Amino acid sequence: MALALTGWQLVWGACVCVLVHGQQAPPGQGSDPGRWRQLIQWENNGQVYSLLNSGAEYVPPGPQGSEANSRVLLAGAPQAPPRRRGGLRRRQAPSLPLPGRVGSDTVRGQARHPFGFGQVPDNWREVAVGDSTGMARARTSVSQQRHGGSASSVSASASAFASTYRQPSSFPQQQFPYPQAPFVSQYETYDPSTRTYDQGYVYYRSASGGLGAAAVASAGVVYPFQPRARYEEYGGGGGEEQPEYPPQGFYPAAPERPYAPQPADGLDRRYSHSLYHEGTAGLEPAYPDPGPDAAQPNGGGGGGTYGGGGGDPRLGWYPPYGNMPPEAYSPPRVVEPQPPFRVLEPPYLPVRSSDAPPPGSERNGAQQGRLSVGSVYRPNQNGRGLPDLVPDPNYVQASTYVQRAHLYSLRCAAEEKCLASTAYAPEATDYDVRVLLRFPQRVKNQGTADFLPNRPRHTWEWHSCHQHYHSMDEFSHYDLLDAATGKKVAEGHKASFCLEDSTCDFGNLKRYACTSHTQGLSPGCYDTYNADIDCQWIDITDVQPGNYILKVHVNPKYIVLESDFTNNVVRCNIHYTGRYVSTTNCKIVQS
């Protein structure tokens, strides 16, 4: 028993000695201030960087003399060597050490500003930023250090971070006038002096005829990037035959244009005759249409620079028509400007003719409207055209529904006579429920003139409930017809709204608003009435369930002149169940 107790005491004593001895770091390892203790890696813009620190990770408060000698190293790229005076050198990849070079010597590559603005000064030596070659060495050295490396391995890894070596090329180098380094994404400043590739790269010609590049690093890292091919290499190399065409610049030189007289006002009106000028029959067109006779500009034979190949002579100065003489200048005619809209031909206007009028027909232009002037149609309306209101049937069908509301919430609409006659009876109370068939409306002016109210401005009516002026007595009629007989089953009303440009097609400007002086509807614009505004309904409180027809008629009395009155009515099939409605088959009809 005593022998066993003595043995256990010896074992515990040995353990205590080992622990005490382990806390004392041998020189050159834990107490070595030059040892790298921390490694931080991150990636920025596709490049991996490393930050090495010889200090401790956690520093206690207070002055620490041992941490004052700690070092910090940022690794990840070769550093910049002195620039040669002969010209600007490309950025080089790390390579194997040269024969006879000591490991402590360094060859700095050309470092660049992180944003590409020129070169980094040479005095910025301690910290270098670049490609990920140093990171491969960082991982190698750190792994060696973690697996029991000695102080010599630590110093070797430190020198690996701060050094980049070059290797002589195993292939014969070829000089190129304008090389492009594979790792530089920014454009460098042009230097007229001679440029060559660095010896650190190995350029080889692939089987496809292009050039490839491989950077052989000391860590065995191969970069798969290749330089951009130049003009000389599109034809291939080696046994392939180069084309006989001489090299040319990025922008080919254009042939010199012959002198053409300029008009007095400096405006070029060669393309305006067929669009805006009347009476062009007496004038020769600026560009004749290409035809069999125009196939050979040089008289069907040779001559000229390009041999007079066939084609469109209006191509002007571009080959193969560079030898075409300039067209003769024709003085402009004073004409009335036209709106850029295509007016629709109403049925009561004469049939358009594509034949040009005789030369003497310009004198009768005041009595007869021009029927065909290029692609612009001008009827005898003093060049102003007419509006054309068209309601949108899909807009009506999309949002038709039934609403039940108390009469006290419809007082403003009652003042404008938007309810059925039973709502104005003496026995009606504010708590009576009215059933309303609500639907939206969107009207477009697809004509060539403004749709303006027929009433003078000083006669517009002010409605205090809705806070706007009514410029028309009857802009729309809303009626509900029986589907079988076509008779009215609900007391529709005359919607009297203010006219404005709610929205416009692309290229058209809104010019009218719901104010006391600017009401109307511009060409290419829409006057929209949502289903939730007052009077945008039909009172169907007294209507029985069944099938009906909803009729929306715009400009019903034809008071404002339009170019087409056959597209002012929308009809929809309504199925009313007593609780809700379903709307189908909304379309534009004549009446």
Curated annotation (Swiss-Prot):
Crosslink (Lysine tyrosylquinone (Lys-Tyr)) position: K494-Y529
Post-translational modification, as annotated: The lysine tyrosylquinone cross-link (LTQ) is generated by condensation of the epsilon-amino group of a lysine with a topaquinone produced by oxidation of tyrosine. Proteolytic processing by a furin-like protease causes removal of N-terminal propeptide resulting in an enzyme largely inactive, but further proteolytic processing by BMP1 results in enzyme activation.
Region spans: Disordered = 77-107, 233-373
According to the record, the residues making up region (Interaction with FBLN5) are 319-386
According to the record, the residues making up region (Lysyl-oxidase like) are 387-591
Per the UniProt entry, what are the Gene Ontology biological process annotations, in alphabetical order? collagen fibril organization
| Keyword Oxidoreductase annotated | yes
What are its E.C. numbers? 1.4.3.13
Q: Which residues carry this modification: 2',4',5'-topaquinone?
A: Y529
What's noted on cofactor binding?
Contains 1 lysine tyrosylquinone.
Q: Enumerate the GO terms in the molecular function aspect.
A: copper ion binding; protein-lysine 6-oxidase activity
The source's superkingdom equals Eukaryota
Which residues of the precursor form the propeptide? 23-91
Task: State the top-level EC class.
Answer: oxidoreductase
> Where does the secretion signal sit in this chain?
1-22
**What Pfam families does UniProt report for this protein, alphabetically?**
Lysyl_oxidase
Q: Please tell me where Cu cation binds in this chain.
A: H466, H468, H470
What family is this? Belongs to the lysyl oxidase family.
Alphabetical list of PANTHER family matching this protein:
LYSYL OXIDASE HOMOLOG 1 (PTHR45817:SF8), LYSYL OXIDASE-LIKE-RELATED (PTHR45817)
Q: How does it assemble?
A: Interacts (via propeptide) with EFEMP2. Interacts with FBLN5.
Name-wise, this protein is Lysyl oxidase homolog 1
